[in-house]
Amino acid sequence: MRATRRGVIGISIAASGALALAACSDDGGGGEVDLEKQSKGAMDGFAADSQFTATEAFTLSLLWTEWPDLPITDSWQFFTEIEKRTNVKLEVTTIPFSDAVEKRSLLISAGDAPTVIPLVYTGEEDSFVSSGALLPISDYVEHMPHFQKYVEEWDLGEMIDNLKQADGKYYMLPGLQEVSVPVFTLVIRKDVFETVGGGIPETWDEMREALVKIKAEYPDSKPLADGFEAASMLNYAAHAFGAQAGWGFGDGMMDDGSGKLEYTAASAGYKQMVEYFRGLVEDGLIDTDSLTAANDGSGGGSVSEKFANELVFAASGSSGTAIEFAQALNETVGEGNYEVLQIAPPGGPAGQVCEPRNFWNGFMLNAEITESENFLATLQFLDWIYYNPEARELLRWGVLDETYTKDASGKITLKPEFRLDAYNINPDGATDIQKDLGWSNSVFADSTESRALKESYNTPTFVEYVDSVLATRTPREPNPPAPLDEMELERASLLATPLKDTVDTNTLRFIMGERDIAEWDDYVAELEAQGLQQYVDLVNTARERFEEENS
């Protein structure tokens, strides 16, 4: 499950954080810093593709999210090897997966957060910027040569610019991805879709046609499932309808095609998406339990069990979910008697599109780092661990020639005495490099990845998935930035939260048939009564100001 959970917590935290717009009024994080006086332990001439090793040892505090089935241990090789290579000892504050968002927010708001706050997705920093709790890290990226190198090489400069807040600075650094494809999409029984469903669906209409055929052949089935309270499926489906939903709802604002922003949940595309899924529910083509069962980070509704018992034939998931489904089918259908495939998100009325090119999780820094004598050394260490290729390989695979080997072509092979259960690699190995050694951990390993590194631990079918998305889907353009100032953030928080609550409740009610779609106009009127137009005007004003100031 961990391969699945790594994706889930990131997306669900990001979705929760996007509307956490409360602002505070403390000052901080913006004063002048004399790095020459705060360079203890820093390396002279630190450059891209070099190993960082502090010239004087120091300890760095770090916030660590703990998954229920991957408890952190002090004895992990991860900690000892990082300290051995860098002269930096990590001091960990642990928060549980179950309420990571709330715990993290409380620590930051109370001024008790550790120096480094990992597992941060773009937009989550917004709620803390005006309080002065976070370092405006854009002021210091000149000291992070690896970050600068890969932003340029992977053509990510414009995306980085979109991280800017109203003051023109950004307050988090993301994980960089050489190639960006949706992490979550549909995982299907390829053999059943080909023999019964008429082939691999390229559009949601083709998906419906296939589900009807599969339902006829397997009448006890409800062939489509989510498992993540509908948030995953609506996330990757919405783009095909010209909308944003589920995990990808964000602040609810979306480019209307003219450069202005509209509230997606009141749009024609959003309504069309809701009507589509309502039709699937009405015809018994979707497992409704999987839309409502509580999600603990692994996917609710016993989807894996239903997939194994041929009650579900397509479900939301990541590359890890595909492995999980295959393992479950081995116990029921039998190995060699099925094919599981992760497919590109189906297209729809808006075209063969998918989510915008995206970052993955990165980090924020407590603004108090500016008072540390190790400030520059900390920047160098984080630049190395987050963006150095050898560091990224270390975090995924462990120690070269000890836990894995690498041939002249760059192919990585885990040594036979080691295994990686999360990706079903060497299942007979005695030592799991994740659970026993701390490599491939959820806090660091997924952040920045080259395509080669991403493919090194995934299956050949995942490589096919990446190829298919890059060849057949066009990423939607990102929404234009509209950073809010402190007063706007406070106002937006008061408006956005009740609007989002109304959207979440009624989206599911419409889909489940608990509310007639004929009441759509009434639903929009309810949003308007909650201040929808004020919210839209507020964000568009910020958008216009940002455009004028940065044109």
Residue spans of the language-model regions?
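Periplasmic-binding protein-like
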Residues: 338-364
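Conserved small-residue motifs centered on glycine
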Residues: 380, 384-505, 514
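Helix-loop-helix "hinge/cap" segment bordering the ligand-binding cleft or interdomain interface
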Residues: 138, 165-236, 251-299, 306, ...
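General small-molecule cofactor/ligand-binding pocket signal
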Residues: 91-95, 289, 341-343
